[in-house]
């Protein structure tokens, strides 16, 4: 049995620094209005595990059966991102996974003009608000829905944290049949 099984396990921890990124906290006194310089200041940690199992057996002289499976878990985190001095801690990216999903928290739908008039002003979102539109939560309590009301919706993003697969290959003489199934988990997609 052990001559027919091949198992591979890898752990990885990758710490990258001096990543090229656009400066966001550059003082305006230096004359960079709206266009800040690029600099090698970013820092990211990427870590996880990979497991692969392969079983191969020859049955008689004409049949070969091969079964394989794999599993990968990956997690990353910004250790340092040059960010502006945000007024609220929930707006920062440092210490969070890459490409987290941020957005507004929906409180339901507006049902009347009176409800719209008594809700936080959403006009900065660019639409003429009418009954039936989504009403968003005023996170910072300033009476207006702005980019400062965006929060972390999920630490998952469109890049899956878990990937897996199962495969089977059967060969008889010079004819072979193979099938492979793969999937992913721990991801979110905004639609």
Tell me the role of every PLM-derived stretch.
Residues 1-101, 173:
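Extracellular/periplasmic, surface-exposed regions of secreted and cell-surface proteins
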Residues 10-13, 55, 149, 179-185:
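Active-site proximal loops enriched in glycine and acidic residues that flank catalytic Cys/His/Asp
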């Amino acid at each position: 049995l052990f001559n027919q099984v091949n198992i591979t396990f890898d752990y990885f921890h990758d710490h990258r620094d001096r990543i090229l990124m656009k400066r966001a906290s550059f003082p305006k006194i230096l004359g960079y209005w709206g266009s800040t310089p690029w600099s090698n200041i970013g820092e990211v940690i990427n870590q996880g595990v990979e497991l692969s199992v392969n079983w191969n057996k020859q049955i008689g002289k004409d049949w070969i059966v091969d079964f394989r499976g794999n599993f990968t878990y990956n997690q990353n985190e910004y250790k340092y991102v040059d960010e502006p001095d945000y007024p609220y801690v929930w707006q920062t990216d440092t210490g969070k996974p890459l490409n987290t999903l941020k957005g507004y928290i929906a409180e339901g739908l507006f049902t009347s003009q009176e409800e719209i008039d008594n809700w936080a002003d959403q006009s900065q979102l660019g639409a003429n608000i009418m009954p039936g539109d989504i009403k968003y939560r005023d996170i910072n309590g300033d009476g207006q829905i702005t980019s400062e009301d965006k929060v972390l919706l999920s630490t998952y993003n469109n890049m899956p944290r878990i990937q897996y697969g199962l495969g089977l290959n059967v060969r008889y003489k010079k004819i072979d049949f193979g099938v492979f199934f793969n999937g992913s988990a721990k991801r979110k997609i905004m639609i």
